[in-house]
Amino acid sequence: ALGGGAILPPPEDCIYIFDEGHRLGDTAIRHFGAECKINSTLTWLERLPKQLKGQAPLFDKDTALSEQLPRIEREAGKLTELVSMAYPLLKEYLDLSDHAEGRYRFAHGDVGAVIRDLAKQITMKTSGWLGRLEVLEDTLSEALSDREYPVPVPDIELFYQQAGNWLSGAERLLALWDRLHKELKKGE
């Protein structure tokens, strides 16, 4: 309802006028899009093993947690390999782009079979890794509330924050590659 009690007719009985319609594409992409910067992603994935090794000695008395860390590191390594493979593929398209910000829009949103296949692999690997990171975050959350936990609270808090950063990075990674691996159906 609009001010004064005016009620709009049903949408199918309306004519829509988009002022600033030339911005509609960019606005839709910002609102519904997903992105990850490949080089930044590779940088934090490559830094992750060193960060894990720094935390491992602090948590060696917690067997469950200390067993999780090498698994998280291995999965991050596999993910790094896959994301590294994406860089040269996507760079080819960026080199074709005339967009000032170095962006490329795929015609009709179709990224092609090669990128779609790689995206599927990255999605599967990221999904599994995300699950491990969620378990790590839950374990650290429980450790924070355990007064008898053998690690000082400030160390747990620091690692909890770091794990949260990894988790949010993995979620962003998954959001993008999950969208890219799905083949568009005709008319979408």
Regions found by a protein language model. Give the residues of each.
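Conserved coupling segment at the C-terminus of the helicase ATP-binding
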Residues: 2-16, 20-188
